[in-house]
Amino acid sequence: MNNELITSLIEEVTRRALLETGVEVEASGRHVHLDRETVDALFGPGYELTHFRDLSQPGQYVCKERISIVGPKSVIHNVVILGPIRKKTQVEISSTDGTALGIKAPVRESGDIAGTPGILLLSAKNSVQLSEGLIVAKRHIHMTPADAEKQQVSQSEIVQVKINGDRPLIFDDVVVRISPDFATYMHIDYDEANACGFKKGIRGQIIKKTKAK
């Protein structure tokens, strides 16, 4: 048995053991996903965003570039851009950010932006006024098919997640997203992170709202 196979087996055993204790939770700060048209408008035709750091989800990354978002009441600077480029531009903030900006953003799943408020985006040289795309991301779990089978959950199922931190609580209305392209993590925003006393590496226990089939 070679070292690579041994390492792979150890990683799989560790993953399964951790899954028994729930899913790891990550807190996501405000960020934007840009489409090709918006990148061109903000940074120039054909501009390529600069990869800075990988995220936990395979193929997703933080870009070096930053922008500002402008609402009726205030401006938030140094907003992170996530890559790669999306089909439609989307801005994800917390409810607290929305209050500061003076815009009430609805709670939506990623990609569900029809009828949402717009917002002004500013780069160092240019601006883009979005007609829609501002949301508060619905809390969710990215999950691999193998982990979903182990947890006995299905695509788009709504579950509860119990967080045993310094301020233990149960998050309701958590949507499960399943794909072989995912890594298994729950994502909450900073408002939710503050509510549960979030610390890096904290885990959540999935509570099914319906009986497993």
From Swiss-Prot:
Pathway entry: Polyol metabolism; 1,2-propanediol degradation
Pfam families the UniProt entry points to: PTAC
GO molecular function: acyltransferase activity, transferring groups other than amino-acyl groups; metal ion binding
Disulfide feature: none
Listed GO CC annotations: bacterial microcompartment
Binding site for phosphate: R86
Cross-referenced InterPro entries: PTAC
Cofactor: Zn(2+)
Keyword terms: Acyltransferase, Bacterial microcompartment, Metal-binding, Transferase, Zinc
EC number: 2.3.1.222
Annotated positions binding CoA: A27, S28, G29, K73, N194
Positions bound to Zn(2+) 2: H140, H142, H187
GO biological process, one term: propanediol catabolic process
Entry's free-text remark on domains: Formed by 2 beta-barrels, each is capped on both ends by short alpha-helices.
Family membership noted in the UniProt record: Belongs to the PduL family.
Protein name: Phosphate propanoyltransferase
Organism: Listeria monocytogenes serovar 1/2a (strain ATCC BAA-679 / EGD-e)
Lineage, opening ranks: Bacteria, Bacillati, Bacillota, Bacilli, Bacillales
